[in-house]
Curated annotation (Swiss-Prot):
GO MF annotation terms: argininosuccinate lyase activity
Residues that span the membrane, as ranges: none
Subcellular localization: Cytoplasm
UniProt entry keywords in alphabetical sequence: Amino-acid biosynthesis, Arginine biosynthesis, Cytoplasm, Lyase
Metabolic or biological pathway: Amino-acid biosynthesis; L-arginine biosynthesis; L-arginine from L-ornithine and carbamoyl phosphate: step 3/3
E.C. no: 4.3.2.1
Gene it is expressed from: argH
CDD domains named among the record's database cross-references: Argininosuccinate_lyase (cd01359)
GO CC terms in record: cytosol
One Gene Ontology term from the biological process aspect of the record: arginine biosynthetic process via ornithine
Name of this protein: Argininosuccinate lyase
Catalytic activity of the protein: 2-(N(omega)-L-arginino)succinate = fumarate + L-arginine
């Protein structure tokens, strides 16, 4: 029987029931719904709605139901209940009879689902923070292993300046640390308890909402009942945090896909995160990374979905808000598996140092060093930049790197150049001169790793 059936004389159509029911999605809130119901039993007992004995019986039945269902969603879905709240109430009534009908006194599904969803976001958010920390640790460990491995750094996907692989790793550590901070902040704002807000105007019973919030491990109760049941900012913020983090994961995946390509050959991926071709026996495809990149789009789609759903809803609750869960659940599932997979990829990644070094030595990546050398000799940087551009054009025509040009050839472009130019054009010099906080010099990267390991 529907929780709202008394108002209606006609039967619900089978098509409408299929369209309206949310149990196939919101069954994932079962644990939170039971936990919230246990707290609500205590709350209504405290104001005399039920006796202490009745409260004890209700709580025992709810805990029994929690144990019976366990982690098997089919136990819930197969019942055909309208939603998770209906399922719990129906099962409770089956266990304790009419006493089960008292539990919903003073409570609406509006504040009930808002509470369930926040509890779920808090639990899953904590698990996501742990996953982000694991990924961060893998990146730091990889940076430490490859702290001095040289590779080209890119702008516009053109070789720009040499960097170390450790420096590349730490760039993504910074990104994922921002993701950690962003999610942590979002969870702080979600840490408010809507229970006791009723349908929209507040419960009619003198519930101590501070005690209720504390019982459910919320930081505090919400402060406006109308906002409490209308708010889905926590869903939006979790999807937003996921979208930004997936952007970072996708960028990292794209870098690694390129580094792993035959054209670059800077890294090798482990067999356990790659697959082959059904036709071409030689193939070893970076499928894990490509799927991370691909799943980013579906996470973005869910963020846009909830934003679009919420953008024009009048206060307070509207049935549109039932659409908040499917996208959220998919976002959390996608983000979680991508974080796990990225950590696994990094744990087995090997840097091919020789090809990476050779690539860093090509493409005139030391041109900036020559410009800096001329500046040190007294030439204004803009003029030095122009001169070195001409040197690069000449070197290309000679099919030689800058460091292989003779002193006479170099002096044809700038009389300031002398024999001491050549030590400045080595890869080692290029790296060591970036000895500034945040730079790619090996000692700076090593120092940064040490700090990250302590954090």
């Amino acid at each position: 029987m529907a929780l709202w059936g008394g108002r209606f004389q006609g039967e619900t159509s089978a098509l409408f029931k299929l369209f309206n029911d949310s149990l196939p999605v919101d069954y994932r809130l079962f644990e939170q719904d039971v936990i919230g119901s246990i707290a609500w039993a205590d709350a209504i007992a405290s104001v005399g709605v039920i006796s202490a004995a009745e409260c004890t019986e209700l709580k025992a039945a709810l805990k029994e139901l929690l144990a019976e269902v366990g982690d098997d969603p089919q136990v819930i879905i197969s019942t055909g209940a309208e939603d998770i709240h209906s399922f719990v109430e129906q099962k409770l009534i089956a266990k304790v009879g009419d006493l089960g009908k008292k539990l919903h006194t003073g409570r609406s599904r509006n504040d009930q689902v808002a509470t369930d969803l926040k509890l779920w976001c808090k639990r899953e958010g904590a698990a996501l923070l742990a996953r982000l920390n694991t990924l961060r640790s893998e990146l730091i460990a990889l940076a430490e292993r490859e702290v001095d491995a040289v590779m080209p750094g890119y702008t516009h996907l053109q070789r720009a300046q040499p960097i170390t692989f450790g420096h590349w790793c730490l760039a993504y550590v910074e990104m994922f640390e921002r993701d950690l901070s962003r999610l942590t902040d979002a969870l702080k704002r979600a840490d408010t308890c809507p229970l006791g807000s009723g349908a929209l105007a507040g419960t009619a019973y003198p519930i101590d909402r501070h005690a209720l919030a504390s019982a459910l491990n919320f930081a505090r109760p919400t402060l406006n009942s109308l906002d409490s049941v209308s708010d889905r900012d926590h869903v939006v913020e979790l999807c937003s945090s996921a979208s930004i983090s997936m952007m970072h994961l996708s960028r990292m995946a794209e870098d690694l896909i390129f580094f792993n390509s035959g054209e670059a050959n800077f890294i090798s991926l482990a067999d356990d995160v790659t697959s082959g071709s059904s036709l071409m026996p030689q193939k070893k495809n970076p499928d894990a990374l490509e799927l991370i990149r691909g799943k980013t789009g579906r996470v973005y789609g869910s963020l846009m979905g909830i934003l679009t759903t919420m953008k024009a809803l009048p206060l307070a609750y509207n049935k549109d808000m039932q659409e908040d869960k499917e996208g959220l659940f998919d976002v959390v599932d996608s983000w979680a598996i991508c974080l796990d997979m990225a950590a696994l990829v990094l744990s087995g990644l090997k840097v091919n140092r020789e090809p990476a070094l050779q690539a860093a030595q090509q493409g005139y990546a030391n041109a900036t060093e020559l410009a800096d050398y001329l500046v040190a000799k007294g030439m204004p940087f803009r003029e030095a930049h122009h001169v070195v551009g001409e040197v690069v054009v000449f070197a290309i025509t000679q099919q030689q790197p800058i460091e292989d040009l003779t002193l006479t050839q170099l002096q044809a472009f700038a009389k300031e150049i002398s024999d001491d130019v050549y030590p400045n054009l080595t890869i080692a010099a290029c790296l060591s001169k970036r000895n500034v906080l945040g730079g790619t010099a090996v000692n700076q990267v090593s120092a940064a790793i040490a700090v990250k390991k302590q954090d």
